[in-house]
Amino acid sequence: MPEVKTEKPHLLDMGKPQLRMVDLNLLTVFDAVMQEQNITRAAHTLGMSQPAVSNAVARLKVMFNDELFVRYGRGIQPTARAFQLFGSVRQALQLVQNELPGSGFEPTSSERVFNLCVCSPLDNILTSQIYNRVEKIAPNIHVVFKASLNQNTEHQLRYQETEFVISYEEFRRPEFTSVPLFKDEMVLVASRKHPRISGPLLEGDVYNEQHAVVSLDRYASFSQPWYDTPDKQSSVAYQGMALISVLNVVSQTHLVAIAPRWLAEEFAESLDLQILPLPLKLNSRTCYLSWHEAAGRDKGHQWMEDLLVSVCKR
């Protein structure tokens, strides 16, 4: 009698959470509460009642085995675990949203929030241009700007906590896209009253002068590329938090500074500055627009990318 083979039933690993047992609608509630950090406002955004949102938050706490949100003043404050989850949840929801029928992006009616990092000193020239363009053609869209990179910027781009970065830094990892927008000429700036400088310097003379710089301790400091050795750093006499304050100090002292030509020209008359060619190999910097590749499939992200390129590219 032939042996009859029977298939063994597939047993679920009950020790692991099963996705089919998770109410994925709770993730949209989590996303809204994270953005609003207020139950009432999140309920309004979602078109739900406040008790329904509170109930969903209670279920989320059980799902993730964490408090997620704690009371803080008149609102709530996310826990460390909530912040850890936020980027992944947003990215997952956005990927699903992009595949739904009719998921087009209409800028004239959208109330979307975009988070941009326009790094100093570029924020001095680009932030107002971007803000005014968005306000003109998409008045309901809200753009939130910040002006510096930090150690978490790649993480923020990866999870779309920051959608775009405009800076002199190129993101070289394969998962990021960096598009060159323009190249800035760099110049040497000194006071017109400087006792030793009244014309162009030779390369060997640059570091014989004392320098004012953007703090070299800051992450991705604008000034850092020119002060990458102990000898060059020994010429630094003043470190400020922003390039405008650096130029202000230069105008009142015998220090010199390196700056983009457009910024030096903007303040040359009011601060009585002289602008000289920079006789160093690094005498220009490329400005890049950068984002994470996963965000590129989002239609709203594509719209903002096109707008930023049209505003910023020279």
Curated annotation (Swiss-Prot):
GO terms for MF: DNA-binding transcription activator activity; transcription cis-regulatory region binding
Residues within the DNA-binding region(s): 39-58
Matching Gene3D superfamilies: Periplasmic binding protein-like II, Winged helix-like DNA-binding domain superfamily/Winged helix DNA-binding domain
Keyword Membrane appears in the UniProt entry: no
InterPro entries given in the database record: LysR-type_TF, LysR_subst-bd, Tscrpt_reg_HTH_LysR, WH-like_DNA-bd_sf, WH_DNA-bd_sf
Pfam families per UniProt: HTH_1, LysR_substrate
Keywords: Activator, DNA-binding, Transcription, Transcription regulation
Domain HTH lysR-type: 22-79
Residues making up the signal peptide according to the UniProt record: none
Swiss-Prot/TrEMBL GO biological process terms: positive regulation of DNA-templated transcription; regulation of DNA-templated transcription
Cellular compartments per GO CC: protein-DNA complex
Domain of life: Bacteria
Disulfide bonds: none
Family under the similarity heading: Belongs to the LysR transcriptional regulatory family.
Protein name: Probable HTH-type transcriptional regulator LeuO
Organism: Salmonella typhimurium (strain LT2 / SGSC1412 / ATCC 700720)
